[in-house]
Amino acid sequence: MCNKQQCISILSKASPFIRKEFGVKSMHLFGSVARGENTEGSDVDLFVDMPPKALRVVALRYYLQDLLGTTVDLIRNHSRLDSFMIKEIERDGICIFE
């Protein structure tokens, strides 16, 4: 499990590969890790803008879980996001890359 600064550092360093391999246009960290409130059982919440190709989304999630050493909850940017989720991302979100 990584803390906020560790997650930001790891993801920032991996961003060229993530962009190229998975077609991710932007990534934001949000949730308990972004707020500095994570516990040992917390997952890492990431909001990404990427093409809607199911296999790539699944592959990215597995890659990120291996990279960060914990469970990753990957939320893709799309028009069906509920307003609560959008507000949480806007409130807590930390831009990793755009």
What do the PLM-derived regions correspond to, one by one?
Residues 1-26, 34-40, 50-98:
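Catalytic core of pol beta-like nucleotidyltransferases
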